[in-house]
From Swiss-Prot:
This is Peptidyl-tRNA hydrolase. GO terms for cellular component: cytoplasm. Gene3D superfamilies: Peptidyl-tRNA hydrolase. It comes from Staphylococcus carnosus (strain TM300). GO terms for biological process: protein quality control for misfolded or incompletely synthesized proteins; rescue of stalled ribosome. Its main location: cytoplasm. TRNA binds at residues 14, 64, 66, 112. PROSITE patterns: PEPT_TRNA_HYDROL_1, PEPT_TRNA_HYDROL_2. Its EC number is 3.1.1.29. HAMAP family: Pept_tRNA_hydro_bact. The active site is at residue 19. Hydrolyzes ribosome-free peptidyl-tRNAs (with 1 or more amino acids incorporated), which drop off the ribosome during protein synthesis, or as a result of ribosome stalling. GO terms for molecular function: peptidyl-tRNA hydrolase activity; tRNA binding.
Amino acid sequence: MKCIVGLGNIGKRFEQTKHNIGFEVIDYLLESNQFKLDKQKFRGAYTIERLGGEKVLLIEPMTMMNLSGEAVGPLMDYYNVDPEDLLVLYDDLDLPQGQVRLRQKGSAGGHNGMKSIIQHLGTDNFKRIRIGIGRPTNGMSVPDYVLQKFSKQEMETMNKVIEHSAHAVEDYVSNSRFDHVMNEYNGEVS
C-alpha cells in the first residue's frame, strides 16, 4: 500500500494559504474521486481507498505543520507502510510559484513539517512533491508569507498546479517507476 500525505495547518484561517498547498492537493484528490477523510487516529485524518486500482492511504496530519511526523509516523507503523512507499506533498519557498519538483528522497530543506516526518521515520528515503510558492518580497517575513492566502491571480495558477500535482500522485500510485513520473511532471506548470 502506498501512503500519500499532504502537509498543512488545520483550521479555517489557514485554508488556501501558501503553507497549505499539500492539503489542497489531497482535497482535490478526495473530491475528484469522491473520497472522504473518514477516519481519525494518531492525530491524523485519513482514508484508505483504491486509486488507479491500487490501495492507498491518504493522510492530512491534524497536528499543525511543524509536528506532522507525530501523525505520519504512527499511521505508517499502524498500517505497516514502508517509507519507500510514502509520498509527501508540501510547499517550497525555494521554487518559483507555479513550479513542481518531484524527488526520490532528500533533506527537509528547511521545511519544519518535513523535518518532523524525517525525525519520526528515522529516514529521508521517501518520495516528495515540492510545490513552489516562491519567496516573500518587500520585506515580508517568511512566517507571514507562508500563512498568507493566495491572491485571486495566484490562485488561478495554483489551481493548475494542484491539478497537475494530483495527476502526478495518481500516476505514481498506478506506475511503480517513480523516475518516469518525475520526468513527466517536473517543471513549470502552465
